Amino acid sequence: MKSLYLIFGLWILLACFQSGEGVRGPRRQHNPRRQQDPSTLPHYLGLQPDPNGGQIGVTITIPLNLQPPRVLVNLPGFITGPPLVVQGTTEYQYQWQLTAPDPTPLSNPPTQLHSTEQANTKTDAKISNTTATTQNSTDIFEGGGK
């Protein structure tokens, strides 16, 4: 049974290796004396030939189009404001402000916070301090109930 697993595992490894080789293109021969044409260099770096010296000058431009959020969340005590304001392609400005809770009192303060009811504190109820001598031994309350 182990030999079957070994054969199956080798078959899978061989299949994966061959599938990876099929996707790969032909290997290039590196020639350090041959200068690469600037038009074939990667365009995302913005590589441009220098007209004065024949060397390549590098200008990196990353276009960012960020819009400020439509809804600003104003939580007291936290930083609020648009997250990032981009001007041009190289200048960044971040505008923020720190807000604290408003110390002014409420315009309509509540007159009474909560209505509370006191418990019945009548002392006319007679409560026995002794326990009954019956088998279940429960307290006996005399009178005073509603």
Curated annotation (Swiss-Prot):
Pfam families: PROL5-SMR. GO terms for biological process: cellular response to lipopolysaccharide; negative regulation of peptidase activity; regulation of sensory perception of pain. The keyword Membrane does not apply. One of its GO terms (cellular component) is extracellular region. The keyword Cytoplasm does not apply. Induction: By androgens; strongly. InterPro entries: SMR-like. Keywords: Cleavage on pair of basic residues, Glycoprotein, Hormone, Secreted, Signal. Residues 23-43, 99-146 are annotated as: Disordered. SMR1 mRNA is about 1000 times more abundant in the submandibular gland of male than female. This is SMR1 protein. The lineage of its organism: Eukaryota, Metazoa, Chordata, Craniata, Vertebrata.
